[in-house]
C-alpha cells in the first residue's frame, strides 16, 4: 500500500515521540510500499528526523510543510491556504490512507480538511478525547458543537486505550476505531543503574532524603506543576526531608520559577532541573514520581516509571485507573490525598505491575498494532474494529 503520515505540530512532546516509533514500524512492514511523511520545516528536530529516515530508507518520501498548527492558529486565511496547498499535494501522492497526528480533535485540522477535499481516507491518531463543554456558557457550548462536527470528519480513529475508544464510539459512531498502545525503550526495564549510583551521578543525597520527581512539559493547564507546588506549601512538614525535582520545559517555565523563588518553603525543597534528553537517571534516583495532570492520554513517563519499578502517583483521570492500582491514584484537585499518596507510594509493591507493563507495552506489540491500523479496513465505515489489546487482569486480582 501507499500510505502517508501528516503532522503539523511545532513541538516535540510524547505524541510526536510515539509518531516517530510509528514511522519506524511502517518502514519495517512488508505491506507498505511507499511512506510519505508530511512535516513542518520549522519543526527542526522532527524535520531532521524524517529527513534522515528518507535518506536511509528508499520507501520513505518527505514532504515539507510551510506552516505549523501553531503558526496558523486563529488566522482563517492562513488556514485556508494551508488546506488548499496540502490538498493539492495529497492529490498527487495517491495515498490509500493518511494518518493525521492530532493531539486533540482541533489540532492538525489543516490536514484533516485537506484529506477530505483530496478525497483521501483519513485516520486520526488521537490520544485525547473531549468529555463535553467545559462550562454551561454559550461560548463553550458553541465550541463543543463545532468539535462534535469535527469528530465526524475522520474515516477512522486510532487511540490509546479502551476508555478513549469508548468515548470515540459515542462521538463518531460511524467511524472505525482501533487501539495502539504506547511503548517505551526496553532500557527502562533492563537498566543496571542503581538508585545510589543514579543519585551520585546527579549530585543528589543518598542519606535517607526522599526524592520526588515530576517529568513532563511545563504546562500548568495540563501537567499541573502549579498544583504540585500548592500541595507542598499546604504540607510543608511532610516535605522537610524531601527534594522535589521538576524536569522539563514549556510555556509556563518562567511562572514556575517565579513561584519557587517567591516562597521560602518551595525554595527549600524544589529544584527546577530543566529539559533532559535522558530522564532514566532521574527516574531511577527517585523514590516516587508524580503526575497530577488535569488530562492525559497514556503518559510515557507513567510507563517508564513502572518499567523502572518506581511508583508514580497520578490523578484519577481519563481511564488511567485501568493501568494503576488505587494506591497510586488520587482524586484530581485533592491536595491532601495527593500528598498522602506520595509518601505512602514507597510501600506499594511494583514487581508484578512492572512485569505486566513489560508485556503490555512491548515494542513487538506496538509494531504489530501500528502496521495493522494502516491496512485497508475490512469492516464498513459504520463498524468498529473489534481487535484490541487484551486488558490486564492484574488490577482485578
Identify the function of each model-found stretch.
Residues 163, 183:
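Carbohydrate-associated surface elements
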Residues 56-61, 257-274:
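Nucleotide-activated donor-binding/catalytic signature segment of Leloir-type glycosyltransferases, i.e.
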Residues 13-24, 210, 217-234, 251-254:
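A conserved mid-protein helix/loop that constitutes part of the nucleotide-sugar donor-binding site
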Residues 45, 79-82, 98-118:
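An aromatic- and histidine-rich active-site surface loop
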Residues 189-205, 352:
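A short helix/loop element that forms part of the nucleotide-sugar donor recognition site in Leloir-type
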Residues 103, 275, 294:
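Aromatic "clamp/platform" in nucleotide-sugar-dependent glycosyltransferases that forms part
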Residues 325-336, 342-347:
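Conserved acidic donor-binding segment of nucleotide-sugar-dependent glycosyltransferases
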Amino acid at each position: 500500500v501507499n500510505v502517508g503520515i501528516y503532522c503539523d505540530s511545532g513541538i516535540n512532546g510524547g505524541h510526536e515521540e510515539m509518531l516517530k516509533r510509528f514511522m519506524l514500524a511502517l518502514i519495517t512492514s512488508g505491506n507498505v510500499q511507499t511512506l510519505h511523511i508530511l512535516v513542518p520545516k520549522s519543526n527542526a528536530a522532527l524535520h531532521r528526523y524524517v529527513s534522515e529516515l528518507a535518506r536511509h530508507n528508499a520507501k520513505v518520501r518527505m514532504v515539507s510543510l510551510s506552516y505549523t498548527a501553531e503558526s496558523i492558529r486563529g488566522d482563517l486565511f492562513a488556514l485556508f491556504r494551508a488546506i488548499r496547498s496540502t490538498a493539492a499535494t495529497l492529490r498527487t501522492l495517491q495515498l490509500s490512507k493518511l494518518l493525521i497526528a492530532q493531539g486533540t480533535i482541533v489540532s492538525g485540522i489543516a490536514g484533516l480538511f485537506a484529506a477530505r477535499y483530496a478525497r483521501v481516507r483519513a485516520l486520526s491518531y488521537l490520544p485525547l478525547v473531549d468529555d463535553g463543554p467545559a462550562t454551561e456558557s454559550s461560548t463553550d457550548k458553541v465550541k463543543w458543537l463545532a468539535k462534535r462536527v469535527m469528530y465526524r470528519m475522520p474515516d477512522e480513529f486510532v487511540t490509546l486505550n479502551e476508555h478513549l475508544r469508548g468515548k470515540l464510539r459515542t462521538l463518531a459512531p460511524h467511524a472505525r476505531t482501533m487501539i495502539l498502545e504506547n511503548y517505551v525503550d526496553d532500557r527502562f526495564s533492563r537498566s543496571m543503574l542503581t538508585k545510589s549510583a543514579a543519585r551520585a551521578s546527579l549530585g543528589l543525597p543518598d542519606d535517607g532524603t526522599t526524592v520526588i520527581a515530576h517529568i513532563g512539559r511545563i504546562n500548568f493547564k495540563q501537567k499541573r506543576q502549579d498544583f504540585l507546588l500548592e500541595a507542598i506549601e499546604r504540607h510543608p512538614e511532610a516535605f522537610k526531608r524531601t527534594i522535589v525535582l521538576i524536569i522539563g520545559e514549556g510555556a509556563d517555565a518562567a511562572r514556575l520559577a517565579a513561584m519557587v523563588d517567591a516562597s521560602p518553603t518551595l525554595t527549600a525543597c524544589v529544584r527546577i532541573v530543566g529539559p533532559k534528553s535522558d530522564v532514566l537517571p532521574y527516574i531511577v534516583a527517585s523514590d516516587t514520581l508524580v503526575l497530577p495532570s488535569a488530562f492525559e492520554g497514556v503518559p510515557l513517563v507513567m510507563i517508564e516509571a513502572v518499567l523502572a519499578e518506581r511508583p508514580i502517583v497520578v490523578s484519577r483521570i481519563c481511564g488511567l485507573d485501568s493501568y494503576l492500582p488505587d494506591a497510586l491514584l488520587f482524586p484530581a484537585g485533592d491536595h491532601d490525598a495527593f500528598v498522602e499518596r506520595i509518601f505512602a507510594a514507597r510501600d506499594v509493591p511494583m514487581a508484578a505491575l512492572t512485569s505486566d507493563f513489560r508485556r503490555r507495552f512491548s515494542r513487538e506489540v506496538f509494531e504489530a498494532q501500528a502496521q495493522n491500523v494502516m491496512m485497508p479496513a475490512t469492516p464498513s465505515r459504520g463498524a468498529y474494529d473489534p481487535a484490541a489489546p487484551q486488558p490486564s487482569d492484574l488490577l482485578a486480582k
